[in-house]
Amino acid sequence: MVPLMELDELCLLDMLVYLEGFMAFVSIVGLRSVGSPYGRYSPQWPGIRVPARPAWFIQELPSMAWPLYEYIRPAAARLGNLPNRVLLAMFLIHYVQRTLVFPVLIRGGKPTLLVTFVLAFLFCTFNGYVQSRYLSQFAVYAEDWVTHPCFLTGFALWLVGMVINIHSDHILRNLRKPGETGYKIPRGGLFEYVSAANYFGELVEWCGFALASWSLQGVVFALFTLSTLLTRAKQHHQWYHEKFEDYPKSRKILIPFVL
């Protein structure tokens, strides 16, 4: 028999998933009209701004801390099962890279508006809790789920997406030589096909995670990722075309050959 407290938390997780889906819809509608206020698109409003490196570290930290907490917590009921451990590890690995590695590699990132930083921190806290608690406490998989075609395909997409994301970030960081300023057209890798190759990689990564986890939690997270990254990708695409007369006309916005 499932304890009452676990039933209450499962109901809470269900409500939070639907809330995240609603947030994805609001994000698509809202950001379409105002754009994504970060980086070079950050409005010149007065107020507090957070330096790029600490902003990235702090805002991503909750999504690394939640799965780590679940791994060391003896009462994590489902982490005795291999599929749950692997899926939670997939989530954790991404956020270890985003929390501990990515901020260190940033070169001259623009300060982040406090409100943007706070919203990102709250989302990572919220989503980190939803994904970590579901996988560690409630998700039920057969032991051989890790050999199922859905899991294997999803895991492959997750891995390929992460490689694309990290490689594309590397290209962006190295556009300027030491001492150079200004902007350049990204070239190489998936940037030959889309304006936002790093975002495409992250989208593929979370779509793979959703397929591998075969869960509403994973699907909604992938949809939320699409809702935010598509807006940013459109901004990049438009900005590149306005900034550079020789910007390749054949490049798509986010998805090669499609969008």
Curated annotation (Swiss-Prot):
Protein location: Microsome membrane; Endoplasmic reticulum membrane
Q: Which domain of life is it from?
A: Eukaryota
Give the E.C. number(s): 1.3.1.22
Q: Which PROSITE patterns match?
A: S5A_REDUCTASE
Q: How does activity depend on pH?
A: Optimally active at alkaline pHs.
One short Pfam family name for this protein? Steroid_dh
Q: Which reaction does it catalyse?
A: a 3-oxo-5alpha-steroid + NADP(+) = a 3-oxo-Delta(4)-steroid + NADPH + H(+); 5alpha-pregnane-3,20-dione + NADP(+) = progesterone + NADPH + H(+); 17beta-hydroxy-5alpha-androstan-3-one + NADP(+) = testosterone + NADPH + H(+); androst-4-ene-3,17-dione + NADPH + H(+) = 5alpha-androstan-3,17-dione + NADP(+)
- GO molecular function ontology, one term from the record: amide binding
- Identify the keywords attached in UniProt to this record, alphabetized: Differentiation, Endoplasmic reticulum, Lipid metabolism, Membrane, Microsome, NADP, Oxidoreductase, Sexual differentiation, Transmembrane, Transmembrane helix
Let me know which tissues express this protein, per UniProt: Liver and prostate (at a low level).
Q: What induces it?
A: Its expression is regulated by androgens such as testosterone.
Per UniProt, what is the membrane topology? Multi-pass membrane protein
Tell me the enzyme class.
Answer: oxidoreductase
Parts of the chain that traverse the membrane: 10-30, 86-106, 111-131, 146-166, 206-226
What does the record list as GO biological process? androgen biosynthetic process; androgen catabolic process; androgen metabolic process; bone development; cell differentiation; cellular response to cAMP; cellular response to dexamethasone stimulus; cellular response to epinephrine stimulus
Q: Name one GO cellular component term.
A: neuronal cell body
State the family it belongs to.
Belongs to the steroid 5-alpha reductase family.
Job of this protein: Converts testosterone into 5-alpha-dihydrotestosterone and progesterone or corticosterone into their corresponding 5-alpha-3-oxosteroids. It plays a central role in sexual differentiation and androgen physiology.
Q: What is this protein called?
A: 3-oxo-5-alpha-steroid 4-dehydrogenase 1
Organism, scientific name: Rattus norvegicus
